[in-house]
Amino acid sequence: MKKYFQPSFVILIIFTVLVLGVVGNMSVDQKRCWATLKENNCVHDECRSMCLKKNPKGHGRCIKSSKGRIICLCGYDCP
C-alpha cells in the first residue's frame, strides 16, 4: 500500500507547488486598461493582431458597442 501512496503524494505535492507558483505570479493589484482600436466592422484576427502590436501582452476582442457597432477593444495591463 505504501508504494501506491508515495507516488501519488509526490505528484500531488508537485502539482500544488506548480499551481501556487502560477497563482502567485499573477498580479492582483494590476489594473486592466482598455483601448478602442477600431470603431466598426471588427474582424477577430485583425483585432488581435493590432492589439498585439500595441502591447505584446494585450488581448484583442471584438464586442458589440452600445450603438450596435462591432468594435475592437484591446485589453492590457496598465503601465
UniProtKB/Swiss-Prot annotation:
Primary localization class, coarse: secreted
Family statement drawn from the similarity comment of this UniProt entry: Belongs to the DEFL family.
GO CC entries: extracellular region
Signal peptide: 1-24
Official protein name in the record: Putative defensin-like protein 137
Domain of life the protein comes from: Eukaryota
Location(s), subcellular: Secreted
Pfam families for this protein: SLR1-BP
InterPro entries assigned to the protein according to its UniProt record, in alphabetical order: DEFL
Disulphide bonds in the chain: 33-78, 42-62, 47-72, 51-74
Keywords for the protein's UniProt record, in alphabetical order: Antimicrobial, Disulfide bond, Fungicide, Plant defense, Secreted, Signal
Source organism per UniProt: Arabidopsis thaliana
Any one biological process term the GO annotation gives: killing of cells of another organism
